[in-house]
Amino acid sequence: LFPNWKEEGAPLNVPVTDDETYFLLSDTKAQKMPYWMVPKSMHNEGNYVISLGNVVRWLGQKAEELEVSIFPGFAASEILYHEDGTVKGIQTGDMGIGKNGEPTHNFTPGYELHAKYTLFAEGCRGHLGKRLIAKYNLDKDADPQHYGIGIKELWEIDPAKHKPGLVMHGAGWPLNETGSSGGWWLYHAENNQVTLGMIVDLSYENPHMYPFMEMQRWKTHPTIKQFLEGGKRISYGARAVVKGGFNALPKLTFPGGCLIGDDAGFLNFSKIKGSHTAMKSGMLCGEAVFEA
């Protein structure tokens, strides 16, 4: 998208320096996998540890330099259709609604945004994307989609323990104790920060299993704890993760628009990466719209 991204100042500041994969055998033991046993799709040579928020802000600035209008804080709430059933655009949510659901004195109705083509990029399980898939039967030839929940924390750690560019992935304990599946990551970013988290498949059998608490248990493992001791958590979050892969992709286009990114399900789970494919899907869709 930006071949000269280094010269243009893209916030990719921490190249991957070491790539490690572990299987946690118990609450105290771990087996580091030999590099030759790690699937090639999990290798990260040439990649960067980034803050996706910083990259998205940088991309937003680049878009605005091209006179693209960005409306942060205004989420699309409804799909607008022409009389012939083709997509006309979207309507943003109403503002100034009280807790009882009634308009208040500062009520402002949502804006209608019309376009020749509307591209939907809501992320995993986007509510408008699901309506479009159902309306146009876009998933009739696709495998059922598969989901997980991803829980993430950002920590500031002791500089003596910080190893910029170290990338760690793994599986095993504690999820294997509850018959659950999933995995974890820990990345050493810039400014003495690490990002860490766990993805748990939503097919877990034990109804009492609590993914958030499983992550808290995981942080007590010596492999993880060694970096966090003396540090502090500075932010956290969670989100749904789409995991069905290539065969679960719906048809991407419909009359008046298309689905891109995780709204369609472009996460490449064999690589545990989706930002690359989300961007590429947007680029391909943009080129198709330009040529239409």
Predicted segments with their positions:
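N-terminal FAD cofactor-binding segment of flavoenzymes
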Residues: 1-29
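Low-complexity, highly charged intrinsically disordered N-terminal segments
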Residues: 9, 32-36, 149
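Short Gly/Pro-enriched turn/cap motifs at secondary-structure boundaries
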Residues: 10-12, 141-145, 169-177, 241, ...
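Rossmann-like flavin
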Residues: 16-19, 27-28, 46, 59-67, ...
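Helix-loop-beta segment of a Rossmann-like dinucleotide-binding subdomain
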Residues: 30-53, 61, 89, 199-201
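Alpha-helix N-cap/helix-initiation motif
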Residues: 44-52, 108, 140, 270-278
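Predominantly flavin-linked oxidoreductase catalytic cores and closely associated redox partners
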Residues: 53, 57-58, 62-226, 284
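FAD/FMN-dependent oxidoreductases across multiple families
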Residues: 178-180, 206, 211-283, 292
